[in-house]
A protein has these predicted regions:
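Aromatic- and carboxylate-enriched substrate-binding clefts and catalytic-loop regions
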Residues: 73-174
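Conserved structural scaffold segments of CAZyme catalytic domains across common CAZy folds
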Residues: 1-101
Length: 174
């Protein structure tokens, strides 16, 4: 078992990468508000889904060398239907600029249905804003349509230099 971590069989058997340029991919750690339900204590602002809370997380990430902050469910008005209607408590352009100054990237949570509906437009729009990736959730099945979605989402996200965290997805067993 101790040799499992050193096993290079996947690299030896996998097809070569289809991506020519991977220089934009920056793996890293993530600060994530979902674990504590935005419940920050001892601050001089009302914690919740708002700029002040996310700026607090960005500051924390910057101080501790954490590369990303995820804005989990709640940043958009209706995440099942539309990823372009942001709640009024969040100014995403301001947050993205603030995070950039602190050398922290932002990743947005997105429900599968809303992301799949217009993923090309979603990826283009948020990439241009400076977002670094998406955490896509609630795929919850493993049929061919869903497998195809994963490939399509990865391809389109890569086109716009966005990383993807497939969350709530099937186990890739082959």
């Amino acid at each position: 078992d101790k040799e499992l971590a050193d096993n290079d069989m996947v690299y030896k058997l996998a097809a070569p990468s289809r991506m020519k340029d991977i220089s934009w991919i920056r793996p890293g750690k993530v600060a994530w508000e979902w674990w504590n339900h935005w419940g920050i204590k001892g601050v001089d602002f009302e914690a919740g889904i708002n700029n002040e809370t996310y700026m607090h997380y960005i500051d924390f990430a910057s101080r501790h060398g954490i590369e990303y902050v995820i804005l989990d469910e709640g940043w958009a008005v209706n995440l099942k239907a539309d990823l372009f209607q942001i709640v009024p408590e969040i100014d995403l352009k301001k947050l993205t600029a603030y995070a950039r100054q602190k050398n922290v990237g932002l990743i947005l949570w997105a429900g599968y249905h809303a992301f799949a509906r217009d993923m090309e437009h979603v990826c283009k729009h948020y990439s241009e804003m400076g977002i670094k990736g998406f955490k896509i959730d609630f795929m919850d099945r493993d049929d061919q349509e869903m497998v195809d979605f994963h490939y399509r989402a990865a391809e389109i996200a890569a086109k716009y230099k966005l990383m993807v965290d497939f969350h709530g997805t099937y186990k890739p067993t082959g």
